[in-house]
């Protein structure tokens, strides 16, 4: 059996009292929160869990590295954020007394495929074309360069421009000799328009394809903060391997594109570990209230597994009816809660 955990720890620089105005400031202190995060990780480290973390800030990355090293873990990290979130990224911790780290990969997810490119409109004016180029096209390009003008991006350009990193490890259990692949990812957060939702579908597709391709036929776990609610297009795509092409969030190939068509559907479906055991997704995994916005409480985090993995147990999670106020709180140092599953990888997976 193997234990897998995913936890968005909330960046050290994103829990300001001026932001989480409905939380006790004492529960927002970065050092206090990190100590509480580590307390939650202690029990899972004691079980030899493979742990995926999201929103690992630069300030916390070194301290988490030391934390995991003291417990015999390798900690793979990729930071890609911006100054305001302290360059937050993702981390994957592997207990080296339990597993042989057969292989590891760190990638900017949008670099893992070739995106379709839109061809520029060609103006053909016969013998006047050189004059058009000299007196119209070139001045426009010069003006754009001087003013730093950038035309609005479509969903393909937006999806390609995201820097979110994904991590993968191929692991072999030292005791049973079975192998499996595990990836962790933190999706972009875009939902306001149909184009935004298509960006999310593109990244959900990329994450599933990446995890399955890196595992090269081995049983596969893909876990993290997907910023998708149950039933969203990206969630449907991952869990069924399919999505109706008439869905508003189905990525449509741009007109006049060059290159190969983008493959939307992953080679196989994956299923939520919590659905396997409980018959449904967690009641919520994120509970936050930003300033005077309406409280947000819903499910955004998942542990997805391929059909050849058996899920024997999942960590019990609270119900929203039993929650008193937004997180972070004294008992929850992040605005997300930790998910965990015990899995069984079939013999012969090597």
Segments and roles (model prediction):
Residues 24-31, 54-58, 84, 156, ...:
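Intrinsic disorder
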Residues 21-23, 67-71, 201, 237-241:
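Glycine-rich, phosphate-binding/catalytic loops in enzymes
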Residues 1-19, 65, 69-74, 155, ...:
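Acidic, histidine-bearing metal-coordination/catalytic regions of metal-dependent phosphoesterases
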């Amino acid at each position: 059996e193997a234990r897998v955990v995913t936890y968005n720890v909330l960046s050290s620089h994103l829990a300001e009292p001026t932001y989480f105005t409905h939380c006790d400031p004492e529960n927002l202190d970065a050092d206090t929160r990190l100590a509480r995060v580590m307390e939650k990780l202690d029990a899972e480290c004691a079980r030899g869990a493979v742990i995926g973390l999201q929103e690992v800030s630069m300030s916390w990355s070194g301290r988490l590295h030391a934390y995991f090293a003291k417990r015999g873990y390798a900690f793979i990290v990729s930071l890609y954020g911006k100054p305001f979130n302290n360059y937050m990224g993702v981390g994957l911790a592997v207990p080296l007394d339990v597993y042989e780290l057969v292989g590891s990969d760190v990638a900017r997810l949008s670099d893992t495929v070739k995106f379709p490119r839109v061809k520029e409109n060609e103006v053909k004016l016969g013998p006047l074309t050189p004059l058009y180029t000299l007196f119209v096209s070139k001045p426009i390009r010069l003006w754009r360069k001087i003013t730093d003008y950038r035309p609005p991006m479509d969903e393909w350009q937006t999806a390609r421009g995201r820097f979110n990193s994904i991590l993968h490890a191929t692991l072999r259990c030292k005791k049973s000799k079975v192998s499996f692949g595990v990836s962790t990812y933190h999706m972009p957060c875009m939902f306001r328009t149909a184009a935004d939702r298509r960006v999310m579908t593109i990244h959900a597709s990329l994450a599933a394809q990446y995890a399955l391709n890196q595992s090269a036929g081995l049983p596969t776990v893909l876990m993290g903060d997907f910023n998708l609610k149950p039933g969203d297009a990206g969630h449907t795509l991952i869990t069924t391997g399919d999505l109706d092409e008439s869905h508003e969030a189905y990525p449509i190939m741009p007109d006049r594109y060059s290159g190969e068509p983008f493959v939307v559907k992953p080679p196989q479906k994956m299923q939520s570990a919590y659905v396997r055991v409980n018959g449904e997704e967690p009641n919520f995994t994120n509970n936050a209230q930003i300033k005077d916005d309406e409280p947000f409480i819903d499910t955004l985090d998942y542990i997805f597994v391929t059909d050849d993995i058996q899920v024997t147990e999942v960590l019990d999670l609270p119900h929203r009816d039993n929650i008193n106020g937004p997180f972070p709180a004294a008992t929850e140092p992040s605005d997300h809660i930790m998910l965990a599953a015990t899995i069984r990888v079939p013999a012969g997976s090597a």
